[in-house]
Amino acid sequence: LLIICLVGCHFKEKRAKQYRDTILQSVQVVIDSSLDYGDALQSYERARALQSHQKYSALVNSTLTKIEGMKDFEGDTTLQVFSKELLVFYKNTLDNEINPFLQSVKGEAFSPEETLVADSLMIKLTMSENQYWERFNWAEKKFYKEEKIATVEK
């Protein structure tokens, strides 16, 4: 009976690791891609910024759909909730702030005023995303510790 319990616990930890890794890897791609997105926006070239915006927005939306489609882990929703919070922040910023700005750019190259707006939007995005990153990192560490994932990592 003790052996069955130990095997069952070890199996739960392996499933927890797989669940965590799936969320972590999905969200990490979005986080890492934000740097390329920022570079494209701050190239001050309309076509490059729009192309990057469409690609990044699609990535955020598909990742959000993937996370929303996942079930909780045995009643624990912490990691899922905070990953969705981060992704919704990106989605709302892209849809409600950056996209309207990009649609308003008239020329191929940003005007001096548009350059200032682009810089301001990126500063705001960067400053705001830190709080969401911190909350997501907290949730990931909490899940890692509570589910004893270290016991199945090598």
Residue ranges and their predicted role:
Residues 1-9:
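Sec-dependent bacterial lipoprotein signal peptides
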Residues 26, 51-59, 82-103:
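Amphipathic, heptad-repeat alpha-helices with coiled-coil/zipper character that mediate oligomerization
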Residues 9-54, 146-154:
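Immediate post-signal-peptide N-terminus of mature secreted/exported proteins
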Residues 63-85, 99-105, 140:
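Short, solvent-exposed, charged loop/turn and helix-capping segments
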Residues 50-57, 80-85, 112-124:
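Short, charged, amphipathic alpha-helical segments
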Residues 105-154:
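A charged, solvent-exposed segment within the mature domains of Sec-exported extracytoplasmic proteins
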Residues 34, 38-41, 60, 64-67, ...:
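A structural signal for well-ordered alpha-helices, especially hydrophobic packing surfaces
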Residues 36-39, 62-75, 109-117:
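Short, charged/polar, low-complexity loop and linker segments
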